[in-house]
């Protein structure tokens, strides 16, 4: 595949750069198509992405419909067919600015001003379209073989919500049609697994703009799953000596100034509220409250480690473009805990947290994950607590512990919490990009800020170390992960309805009611479908919509024999005695079988 660089020389593309060049060129061709259809278009940035490309554009008052996006793609295909040569050129700063002024490219001009040290700028041109770019690109527009415009959304200029909201138009591009077809098949699978779609079908949760974007509400079925997850992780934690607490969802601004969140995390927080001369804010995380619980009384080294846990509601101001059902919202509940320990206990506490993470993953059959040691960017003094000695000590300590424990990990710069390094466990869901599910963070910073102490063996006061950790992450995100992994087919212990009783006709309704009552008495979550519908319809609804683990299809034969016909998710049918079936289901519930 031939590509052209900004100095004009043409060469074969390195294989690992092919897709990037294809997608970057696709962004330029899309921009050219937009400019032809909307001459007022003023372009911002248009990079290649992991699967495709996008361009942020100011269209003035113009709003785009799905039909408009289709027309842009149609125009792109015309440009490809025109087989326009793509040529680079370089201009000194003054001429480059003049060119952009003539073309009314206001965002490019502002970007050039940000690049104050640059004395010249490179451009690429195809036909009438010119874009400021360092390249490289395909040599002709016809070399773009397989692409598709996928969606539009909003994006702030320079990702700053104080700036103007632009229209972001996304697309995908691949080497050939076969790769595009494979991607579209993957997207169809993603749509079928999407937790928002399944959540709506199963009645798990809902959202409403009147309540607010990013503020999901759990319905009875969804809250049942949520409570089961809460019970599961609390049992695990209690067995390890965790002490569970409950703290308020708000705190004073001064609390977050003390912790450092106000300086380093304010852009992710909701605005402060003024009440009776004091400023309060919805909490974005729970560590300040837990620090205050520790500070509530004196501690001896004998009290440590002290493990404070909470299923805690938190609030973060996520931009509207990043919101995604219960996977990412502005309100969520963290499976949070803070472990206060001595320096000598760091290794054993990190080991215990890691063991709990991996034990939990085994319980849920989570196998596709990787461990990341997230470190600070030393050059970013604004984002991180400014104490080089503390950071070096904390990062080396966590690195050494993970190495000693034999945990394979990669390191990523700039991903630490503002107060300390962390181990992130990133999962690869059934569809989409990986994200962090579990975390364990080492903190020497907040205990000092809150003047936390314990009396050591020698009678002197010392500052404890704190481990911030979340095993399920947020229950909301973990539930979204499970929905997409299982397509809503939860294991029996987790299913909102574990058994659905389906009378074949009104003649067996009385027997069905008696069986339902017996299952309820056994502690099984059961629903009776007494609608006057054909049995085939009832089975499809239970299997495809409710996704129940077991259906009891009860006809005259079962009523006469006093047994049940059991139909599982695979469609396999077995006749069982009632007590035998109850024993089977209750065993699955008790053992939390998958």
Which residue stretches match the model-derived regions?
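NTP/phosphate- and nucleic-acid-binding module
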Residues: 1-42, 50, 56-594
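Conserved P-loop NTP-binding catalytic core
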Residues: 45
